[in-house]
Curated annotation (Swiss-Prot):
Membrane spanning stretches: 19-39, 47-67, 77-97, 106-126, 151-171, 224-244, 258-275, 285-305
Protein name: Cytochrome c biogenesis protein CcsA
Native source species: Prochlorococcus marinus (strain SARG / CCMP1375 / SS120)
Function: Required during biogenesis of c-type cytochromes (cytochrome c6 and cytochrome f) at the step of heme attachment.
Stored InterPro entries: Cyt_c_assembly (IPR002541), Cyt_c_biogenesis_CcmC (IPR003557), Cyt_c_biogenesis_CcsA (IPR017562), Cyt_c_biogenesis_CcsA/CcmC (IPR045062)
Family matches, as PANTHER family: CYTOCHROME B_B6 PROTEIN-RELATED (PTHR30071:SF1), HEME EXPORTER PROTEIN C (PTHR30071)
Family: Belongs to the CcmF/CycK/Ccl1/NrfE/CcsA family.
Subunit details: May interact with ccs1.
Amino acid sequence: MNLILMINLFLYINGLDPVLTLGSLAFVLILISLPFSFWNVGENSNSSIVRILIASANILLAIQLVFRWIQSGHFPISNLYESLCFLTWGLTFIQLLIERTFPYPLIQAALTPISLLSIAFASFVLPDELKASSSLVPALKSNWLVMHVSVIMCSYAALLIGSLLSLVVLLSSSRETLQIRSNSMGIGGFKNKSENLNIVKSIDELIPITFSKSEELDNLSYRTITFGFLLLTFGLISGAVWANEAWGSWWSWDPKETWAFISWLIYAAYLHTRLSRGWQGKRPAIIAIIGLFIILICYIGVNFLGIGLHSYGWFL
């Protein structure tokens, strides 16, 4: 905390807003990492440089959010600028977790641009009045703000990343056919429907199934989307409880709530096709990509309308 206060004091002495400065620095780091991430795809190698840059940007965004929390006196997710910075933090954090367990260069190339676009939009597109810290209206002065909004934003980050991984699966599976028939949780892992489960005398008799990169990406996408879907479900429930406490209504069907519910239905359909129908590869990937656009409409598109309880009211 002393280090954060020292950085804050240094920036103020030099006439710089610490929140905006740290956001811009995070943008620069992610921008520098972008060409390296694409270069690594051609070289078929995973770059530690990209991981270091993304991790540094993630730390800067975390410090930035702490600064804004100190400035405003409330959890920093009350306007579009703060939520975009929080979203970028979530995107970079999940990317780092994924790369740690699955160091595949195509992941860096697929996920880095969405973080760059998010922080660039926040830093250079939004007007100054939406970047400024502001006090909360009485209805938002609740512990539900932290629980509901942070969970929803983390769900957006996970669903966006999972959907982008599905896009990679769709592109890569056009050159190879996924053979595994399972629900991506290790159940029913047979390549042919005619194969039966037989009792073996020893583990040595079992023939391991090797997974291609597209199969591993498909499984990774499924797990990431599942995590995001659970967060979205919890976020919608907590939002309904909060709305009932604040406005006396569980659900008002304003644009944000409507599109959030549509997003939930799309990803519920995605999980249903995988768990119940056994779909793998291209078909569920298409559903996830549809969900990607729905999430973007839910998060950014609603602000074009400028109406509803959840709109930041910038565009119109």
